[in-house]
């Protein structure tokens, strides 16, 4: 299977890339700036450096034509969610653009969201609870969640290192 991983150098993306790097899948790893680090531990992949703040993701999707897109892109709290324009573009709009392309081309999308879509005041949240984030990160990630027949959105709570 041809798999495109977006945000391949982030907390989630680099572990998925590392795991799938030992498979027989054809991998395309996108990192805005750090593909040289990925190349140190994944040798059987193609690398791209699209910056989705400046470039249209559909260019990369059309160029690579993956069967599966794994979207791990996100403007996190410590990486500038206070720059609301970037958070809106990457956390909120980008997933819907990818989902639209995936649906149009009969491809699959796995999109990573976050438990930060919840304020934390209620506790014991389920997937049926309404999003009630109070910060820019949670608000934009919540609005970026995709519900489509060809899409799996995963709300995860990840704390860890990036490359």
Spell out what each predicted region is:
Residues 1-24:
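N-terminal Rossmann NAD(P)H-binding glycine-rich loop of SDR-like oxidoreductase domains
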Residues 96-132:
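Conserved Rossmann-fold NAD(P)-dependent oxidoreductase catalytic core, especially the SDR/UDP-sugar
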Residues 46-90:
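NAD(P)H-binding glycine-rich loop region in Rossmannoid oxidoreductase-like domains
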């Amino acid at each position: 299977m041809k798999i495109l991983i977006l945000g391949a150098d982030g907390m989630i993306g680099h572990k998925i890339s590392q795991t799938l790097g030992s498979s027989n899948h054809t991998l395309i790893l996108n990192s805005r700036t750090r593909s040289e680090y990925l190349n140190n531990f994944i040798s059987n992949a193609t690398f791209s450096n699209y910056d989705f703040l400046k470039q249209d993701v559909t260019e990369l999707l059309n160029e690579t034509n993956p069967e599966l897109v794994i979207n791990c892109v996100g403007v996190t709290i410590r990486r500038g969610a206070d720059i609301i324009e970037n958070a809106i573009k990457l956390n909120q709009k980008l997933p819907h653009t990818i989902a639209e392309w995936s649906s149009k081309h009969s491809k699959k999308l796995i999109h990573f969201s976050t438990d930060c879509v919840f304020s934390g005041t209620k506790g014991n949240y389920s997937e049926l609870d309404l999003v009630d984030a109070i910060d820019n990160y949670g608000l934009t990630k919540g609005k970026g969640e995709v519900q489509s027949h060809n899409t799996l959105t995963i709300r995860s709570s990840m704390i860890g290192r990036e490359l």
